[in-house]
Amino acid sequence: MAAQGVSKAQYLQRYLSGPPAAQPRRRRKKKLPSGSGRAGMRIVDDDVGWSSIAAVPEKEEEEDEGDMPVVAEFIDERPDEVKLMEEFRTNSKWKLLGDRDEDSPSSDVSVPAKATTRQQRHDSPDNSPPRRVRHDSPDLSPPRQERNNSASLLPRKERQHGSPDLSPPRRKRHDSPDLSPPRRKRHDDSPDLSPPRRKRHDSPDLSPPRRKRHDSPDLSPPRRQRHDSPDPSPPRKKRHDSPDLSPQEQQTTPDLSLQRKKRYDSDPDSSPSLRKRARSPGHKKPSRTKDASPVKKLRRDSDSPPPRRGTQNASEADLSPQGKNHRALPSGKGQHGSKSPPDLSRHHYPDDKGSPKKGNMMSGVRAGLVSADVLRREQQELRKQERSSKHLEEESRHTETIFRDKSGRKRDLVQERLEQQQKDEAKSERDEQYARWGRGLAQGRQQQQNVEDAIKEMQKPLARYIDDEDLDRMLREQEREGDPMAEFIRKRKAKESKEKKEKPRYSGPAPPLNRFNIWPGHRWDGVDRSNGFEQQFFARMANKKAVQELAYKWSIEDM
């Protein structure tokens, strides 16, 4: 299983580094419609007179000038545009048309999207012959001669060489700083044309590296020779069709342009990395200078893209997707131009950090095909997290639950239970007292006395005899109707009650009735101070009773 996993990883690496021969052709065909439309427009520009289409390029040029970050991206192309301006001061409209229609350096200066469109044109083999015509028309015309007069032949030839062959433009972009002294010469020769865009590019800090790069005379003569030899060079355009050279060129071109941009824009973070990139392709560049000419010859003879793809896979497997992305850029000029630097910086470190957009699963493990080292690292991290959380689990098991009220204060449940118990006891006592009062205190006492008497009688033998004292006393105390001794008995009880000091009772005329038969106090003066409710109550009861009696008598009248 491990061997199969390694084979899959190798297969994925091959697939990502270099797509198969059929896929890049299809991608080129997809990208051709956007680039082909522009190529068709350029062909129409060649056919139509320069004066008729002059107005449209002026607007585009103004838009390019207004888009400052896009202008800052391609420094080499801007100085070339300055050369075109110097050469054709009399007619600025024709210069703008030449910048866009032809693959001249002015088009490179205008927008990075235009540079990418060139790459697309080089990628499309059908558009190569018209490009030759375009290169022949502006390159052979006075522009080159005037550039020779203005001592700026090297950048011009480099650009001309960059238009048919993408490998030389890489050198040109790596050699982009040698164009800085010609800029100074141009500013010295024609200071009027420099201010619009070149104020940013005229930053003196960037000039010394350009001098150093411009001081290297080795790159300029080979370019002239190569440009002189392959003027009619459809195979070179086919080289641009080759995916390995085109992505390399595209990647080197945005890198150098970004270096210049960042130098002029004073971006210290990304500039050193871009310079290192420019140096690294620069080291590759001598190999290109030595090896590119025989390779070009072989490609001219063979005209077959597959070996180029192989070289692309061998040399720059990571740069190929960047080149494709740059080819897709021309649709959005300013936006893609401004977004290109971060994209390139990401592609610089694909192996160290991996793709930043890789997804992770819910468990935190990286998704997709992962190496054994990455899995081992992830497992170790998970184990560390589990160990760090173990002591928390132990503490949480034995800790008491903390309850809080709405205000956030801790609740003492034990104290709350005690308080609630006390409240319940007090409530039960109060309820019992009210229940006792409701039943009646006298009735309660009588009931208690009866219970005591019953218990006492239970202790006596079953049969009662006449000489039983308790029975004899109970019978003597009873009052009987018609008993001559009854009055004597009452008086005797009254005397005994006085001795007991009982409360005095009311002894006046009969008081008014009430629902509960409550007797008035002994101090009542006989005045009724009620609201008359009791009288009305008894009147209603008497009326009701009378009606019932009358109805009963009426019902039994015939009987």
Curated annotation (Swiss-Prot):
Ranges of Basic residues composition bias in the record: 274-287
Top-rank taxon: Eukaryota
One Pfam family linked to the record: Bud13
Major subcellular site: nucleus
Biased composition (Low complexity): 436-449
GO cellular component, one term: U2-type spliceosomal complex
Subcellular location: Nucleus
Ranges of biased composition (kind: Polar residues): 245-256
Coiled-coil regions listed in the entry: 373-431
GO biological process: mRNA splicing, via spliceosome
Matching PANTHER family: BUD13 HOMOLOG
Function, as annotated: Involved in pre-mRNA splicing as component of the activated spliceosome.
Subunit comment: Part of the activated spliceosome B/catalytic step 1 spliceosome, one of the forms of the spliceosome which has a well-formed active site but still cannot catalyze the branching reaction and is composed of at least 52 proteins, the U2, U5 and U6 snRNAs and the pre-mRNA. Component of the minor spliceosome, which splices U12-type introns.
Similarity annotation: Belongs to the CWC26 family.
Name used for this protein in its record: BUD13 homolog
Protein's organism: Gallus gallus
Gene from which this protein is expressed: BUD13
